[in-house]
């Protein structure tokens, strides 16, 4: 589970002084556990999550990390949390829960676009809903062109 992505779900962006909600992430985990009894759920969060949440939620984030309920990628990990989410899913043959397209990773991990490998998450009127989705295809990068004046 892309914990950082779900914690930001439905929240105002950082540029508008928004903050992720750890309570929302915890609710998503509980909902997923209820809907998929007996399944292992790996929650991955970027290192910035503990700093971005409100001061009131910060101790809960730190406790979840200390208890191993939430994992963070090691410092300096290329691709940060997204890379760890993908690596865990690949290692265990799991399904990724995220609304991210993982565009920078699609070429090296074509299975990301296979049906059933990614579920999107939506919070609506107190209910978390998880639907199959196929990430948008990564756009090929174009070489930059320069114009002379």
Residue ranges and their predicted role:
Residues 1-13:
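Metal-dependent nucleic-acid phosphoesterase active-site entry motif
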Residues 6-9, 26-30, 37-149:
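Nuclease catalytic cores that cleave nucleic-acid phosphodiester bonds
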Residues 12-29:
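…and closely analogous acidic/polar surface helices at protein-protein or active-site interfaces
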């Amino acid at each position: 589970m892309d914990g950082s992505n779900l914690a930001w779900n439905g929240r105002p962006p950082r540029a508008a002084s928004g903050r992720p909600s750890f309570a929302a992430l915890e609710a998503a985990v509980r909902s997923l556990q209820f809907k998929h009894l007996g399944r292992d759920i790996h929650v991955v969060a970027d290192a910035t999550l503990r700093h971005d949440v409100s001061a009131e939620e910060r101790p809960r984030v730190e406790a979840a990390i200390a208890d191993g309920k939430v994992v963070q990628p090691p410092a300096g990990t290329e691709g940060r949390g997204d890379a760890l989410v993908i690596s865990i899913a690949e290692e265990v043959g799991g399904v990724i829960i995220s609304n991210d397209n993982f565009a920078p990773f699609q070429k090296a991990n074509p299975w990301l676009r296979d049906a059933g490998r990614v579920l999107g998450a939506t919070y609506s009127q107190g209910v978390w809903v998880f639907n199959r989705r196929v990430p948008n295809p990564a756009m090929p990068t174009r070489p930059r062109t320069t114009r002379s004046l």
